[in-house]
Structure formats: structure tokens, C-alpha cells
Regions:
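Short, low-complexity N-terminal intrinsically disordered segments enriched in polar/charged residues
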Residues: 1-17
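Short, well-ordered alpha-helical segments enriched in acidic and aromatic residues
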Residues: 21-34
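Central antiparallel beta-sheet cores of small beta-barrel/beta-sandwich binding domains
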Residues: 15-19, 34, 58
Length: 109
């Protein structure tokens, strides 16, 4: 079984949107924070000097992914976009997987 990044684009876009509007409660409610405390995520984003914006389609052309056979997941590394910079040097690391025909993502690192 292999997973394709295209399966997860809508849910990744939604996750980045919630980050861009500082809605960490939604991320936690959906269990997308993985082992990361949403308070820690919020603090990192708060101290980043630029404003995160929703991911454009171009971000997914630049994403790197790797299928992890043991976990049956797709680890994805995708650049954030900011209002000031466009493509940012800050990356989002996610683990993407399927559960009962639903696509799910959770933050890595």
C-alpha cells in the first residue's frame, strides 16, 4: 500500500489555514497535533517574525514526501508561506495516514 500526497492536500490546507488564523483549538480537537502540545506550536508560530498565510497550490509542488512502510504513513515536509516572504524557510512536517477510509494528518517534531 502506498499513499499519494494529493489525497491529503485538502486536509493539509485546512491545517495550515487554522495555523494562519491562530486557531490551535481546532487542530487539537481533530487530534492533528500528534505528540506536540498546541501551546508549543502556538509559541513557535507567535515568535516567528512573519505572518503565516494559507498554503498556495505551489507549496505542494515543493513538498517532499516519503512513504514509511512500518507505519503505513506518508511523512510530508512542506514550506510555509508568509505574507512578507512568500515561500518561507519555516517548514511544516506531517505524518499522513488513512484510517477507516478517512485521510488524517498529524504534526511531526
Amino acid at each position: 500500500m502506498s499513499l499519494e500526497l494529493s489525497t491529503f492536500i485538502p486536509i493539509i490546507k485546512e491545517l495550515v489555514y487554522h495555523i494562519s488564523i491562530d486557531d490551535y483549538a481546532s487542530i487539537e480537537h481533530k487530534g492533528q497535533n500528534g505528540d506536540i502540545l498546541v501551546e508549543d506550536l502556538a509559541e513557535v508560530i507567535h515568535w516567528y517574525p512573519y505572518k503565516i498565510i494559507p498554503s498556495p497550490d505551489e507549496a505542494f509542488d515543493l513538498a517532499e514526501s516519503c512513504f514509511i512502510e512500518e507505519k503505513k504513513s506518508l511523512d510530508v515536509y512542506i514550506p510555509f508561506w508568509t505574507k512578507e516572504e512568500g515561500r518561507s524557510d519555516l517548514m511544516l512536517a506531517l505524518s499522513c495516514y488513512m484510517n477507516d477510509a478517512s485521510s488524517l494528518v498529524s504534526l511531526l517534531i
